[in-house]
Amino acid sequence: MKLPISQRLLACCDYVSPGAVVADVGCDHGYLSIHLLETGLARQVYASDIRPGPLDSAVKNANKYGVSQHISFYLSDGVQALPRDFDTLVCAGMGADVMISILEKAPWLRDERYRLILQCQSKTPMLRRYLSQTGWTIRREQVLRDGRFLYTVLEAFWGPGEPLTPGQCYVSPALLSGKAPLLPEYIAWVRDHLGLSVNHKSNPDPWETEAYQELCALEEGL
């Protein structure tokens, strides 16, 4: 039977190295976990959710698709209840504030053994800024369309990197280097939304203003 998995989740799976031990935090119905095991990308998955309902659904789906022997389920706030022997943390479909809270509550993740795969639903510049300021380096990032909307998926490693400028918090160097077909559309969309904020305030935020100026210059150079 065909797994009803979204393009956003498939894009997250593309960044998982074969044979990984994955923590799928905010697993919802478990589709990402199931796909990783069906395709052999993960050899073990720790699936967690803070809500009992979605977690129960994930358990049922794992049994339905025959992969339950390789998934352990946890009712957990972020990674708090999970074993620490995974190597890849996937968070998909959350806002930046939730992802940042998860990372802040688990300082032990700041270790080279872990990598993050993050698909942010809102306030993505806030997430990029946080990662840059706390020692994470965005190694890869891609933009994709799922339905009517554009999303990004990023991969981050713990370790030193060049601090992001305000504009790079909106369009990261990793995203630019990928040269995805949707990149110009994404940059224009981000610039338009940021412009609404900057141009309609009597006292615009200096950080947002600098970011907007960077994005306008970036568009001119494309």
Where are each of the predicted segments found?
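Conserved alpha-helix/loop element of class I SAM-dependent methyltransferases that forms part
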Residues: L3-G19
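C-terminal substrate-binding/active-site "lid" region of AdoMet-derived donor-dependent transferases
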Residues: K105-E155
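S-adenosyl-L-methionine
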Residues: D56-R84
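Conserved class I S-adenosyl-L-methionine
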Residues: G19-D28
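An accessory alpha-helical subdomain
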Residues: G159-P160, P166-L222
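Glycine-rich SAM-binding Motif I of class I
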Residues: G30, I34
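Conserved SAM/SAH-binding beta-strand->alpha-helix loop
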Residues: R51-G53
